[in-house]
Amino acid sequence: EISACLVGSEMCIRDSTGGASNLTYLLRYPTRDLILRRPPAGTKAKGAHDMRREHDIQRALAPVFPAVAPMIAFCDDAGVIGSDFYVMERLDGIILRKNIPAELGLGEAEVRALCTAAIDQLVALHSIDVAGTELERFGKGEGYVKRQVDGWSARYRKARTHGVRHGTGSFEKVMAWLDEHQPHDVGNCLIHNDFRFDNLVLAHDDPTRVIGVLDWEMATLGDPLMDLGGALAYWVQADDDRIMRGSRRQPTHAPGMLTRDEVWQYYAHASGRAISPKDQL
């Protein structure tokens, strides 16, 4: 199947913009465009850059989530290009970066429609019933929130520099607060874990319509509100302070975009999930 895609006709290979972890290449043929994804070279963290898993999640999603790119094939023969890789169809559309291009001509109403369409994709993903499907194997079950808090605290302690004083003013206070205030899981569903505008593909003929969701390398089974919270962590709005605005990587500040409060309220209404004050911390 891989050979049928990659052999037999003239091809142009280009490094594709996007993908901050795994490497993404555009394979341009006379009659079609494909995308090849492979891990970076060098030493990799255990369990990271699992190309088979990333491929299999998207393949399993295809029957129940139309916004995933069709998978072509996975290859674990390192003799082909030096690593595992997979090939998928290219979703031809618009990917937003830091700002909305002026040439799209989107007014405030269209920007709001784009924003709610993005949240609708997250709601749709979290609404998938994974029980009894292939998707059920991509997670560890209940306890996702605790695993994240415990896991990241442990990584911090292993990575900190020896000989540096820790205590007052260190990250220990933050970790203690997170441990004390972590909410109970509200559900167990497939979560994307990197849901932001530069991982969405918009239709050329209607940029308020989402036709694709990309970069599934961190997807897993977990708490949907953790996925929502992760998305909001990137959500820099127009009235944020200078430091926050300086970290903005997507056009969430644009006139018409929902604020963070409006995002979680819209999500709660669309998903039917109650979000408590503790969940908002």
Q: What are the language-model segments listed below?
A:
Residues I2-C12:
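Short, small-residue-biased leader/transition segments that mark boundaries at the very start
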Residues G139-K140, A274-L281:
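All-alpha amphipathic helical-bundle segments outside canonical DNA-binding/catalytic cores
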Residues L190-H192, F197:
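Catalytic-loop of the protein kinase fold
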Residues R14-L190, H204-T208:
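ATP-binding pocket architecture of kinase catalytic cores
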